Structure formats: C-alpha cells, structure tokens
Curated annotation (Swiss-Prot):
Belongs to the DMRL synthase family. It comes from Methanococcus vannielii (strain ATCC 35089 / DSM 1224 / JCM 13029 / OCM 148 / SB). This is 6,7-dimethyl-8-ribityllumazine synthase. It catalyses: (2S)-2-hydroxy-3-oxobutyl phosphate + 5-amino-6-(D-ribitylamino)uracil = 6,7-dimethyl-8-(1-D-ribityl)lumazine + phosphate + 2 H2O + H(+). SUPFAM superfamilies: Lumazine synthase. GO terms for molecular function: 6,7-dimethyl-8-ribityllumazine synthase activity.
Amino acid sequence: MVNLGFVIAEFNRDLTYMMEKLAEEHAQFLGANVVCKVMVPGSFDMPLAIKTLLKKDNIDAVVTIGCVIEGDTEHDEIVVQNAARKIADLSLEFEKPVALGISGPGMTRMQAEDRIDYGKSAVEAAVKMVKRINDIKNSN
C-alpha cells in the first residue's frame, strides 16, 4: 500500500475542500492510504510542509492541493511558478514523488471550479510514481 501525505492550501478553501475530497476518494479507490494532512495558508507556503512530510519514513509521496485564481496583477503566476519549482526540487532532493495538484495560474473562478479534479490527478500521479520508482529500484 502506498502511504500519502497531503498538503492543502487554505486559500480558496471552498475549492480546495472539493479538490481534497475528490483526492481522498481517489486514493481510497487506488488502495492508497492518506496518513497525514497538513493545512497551509496558501500554495506559496507549501514547500516547508512538504519537506517535513518527506522526512517521515511512513510517507511514500506527497500530494499538493491548491487553487490560485488570477487577480489584477501577476501575483498568481509568481506564486505558482515558485511553488512548482520548489516542489520539483524537493521531490528530487528526497527521492520521493511530490505530485502537483495546484490549479492555476491565469484562471478565473469559473475555470477553477471546472478544475477541481486536479487533486484527483495528483493522487493518480503520486501512486503511479511510487510504484514505478519501486519497480526501478527492484529491477536488475
């Protein structure tokens, strides 16, 4: 069984709540176990929580769940680009998958509502990567 940690943004919580519930249902469907959930203020705040989870022996992968809606400035792009880069760096540093379930940037609220399945897709990616990395490690 694959053990997952979730890092969930509180910003736009009505949307991240729906994303979280779909992600949990999909984890259960795939036979994965969500062993820990950490709430953070926003997507930009995720890296430290991700790093803390990746240090835990009982976490095989981390799933991020966030929603960054376009505003009047380019703030949404800066948030998502920096979060995505750091998330990828942490995955490589700890040699564990960290799946990007953050919707945005450049989307309206209506588009965000249409993309609540990003959390589900992130769970799918995390579980697949854990299994595939384990296959590589166990092959001759």
